[in-house]
Swiss-Prot record:
Electron carrier protein. The oxidized form of the cytochrome c heme group can accept an electron from the heme group of the cytochrome c1 subunit of cytochrome reductase. Cytochrome c then transfers this electron to the cytochrome oxidase complex, the final protein carrier in the mitochondrial electron-transport chain. Binds 1 heme c group covalently per subunit. Heme c binds at C17, C20, H21, M83. One of its GO terms (cellular component) is mitochondrial intermembrane space. The keyword Cytoplasm does not apply. This is Cytochrome c. Keywords: Electron transport, Heme, Iron, Metal-binding, Methylation, Mitochondrion, Respiratory chain, Transport. Its main location: mitochondrion. Belongs to the cytochrome c family. GO terms for molecular function: electron transfer activity; heme binding; metal ion binding. It is found in: Mitochondrion intermembrane space. It comes from Gibberella zeae (strain ATCC MYA-4620 / CBS 123657 / FGSC 9075 / NRRL 31084 / PH-1) (Wheat head blight fungus).
Length: 106
């Protein structure tokens, strides 16, 4: 997995993710769970967010590799997720978004 461009990732987040997710420390849940503190967190574990059983039971920890695979096709990676996002097919886009998320969700 190649390093991504944070600026391009920020633009992808703004256009593809921000309507449902926040990255700020006190951003809170929207349609989707808050993403602050994402790295090292288990699927289905954000307090106050109503996950599907599929998300709660997946049991993986979010990191560069799991996000890279998930962001390509969320419904394939976690069948039963309620995330409506179709995914990012281009590896470069996924790398850019992951670079932004890694930087902005600390």
């Amino acid at each position: 997995m190649a390093g991504g461009d944070i600026k391009k990732g920020a633009n992808l987040f703004k256009t593809r993710c921000a309507q449902c997710h926040t990255v700020e420390k006190d951003g809170g849940n929207k349609i989707g769970p808050a993403l602050h503190g994402l790295w090292g967190r288990k699927t289905g574990s954000v307090e106050g967010y109503s996950y599907t059983d599929a998300n709660k039971q997946k049991g993986i920890e979010w990191n560069d590799d799991t996000l890279f695979e998930y962001l390509e096709n969320p419904k394939k990676y976690i069948p039963g997720t309620k995330m409506a996002f179709g995914g990012l097919k281009k590896a470069k886009d996924r790398n850019d978004l992951i670079a932004y998320l890694k930087d902005s969700t600390k």
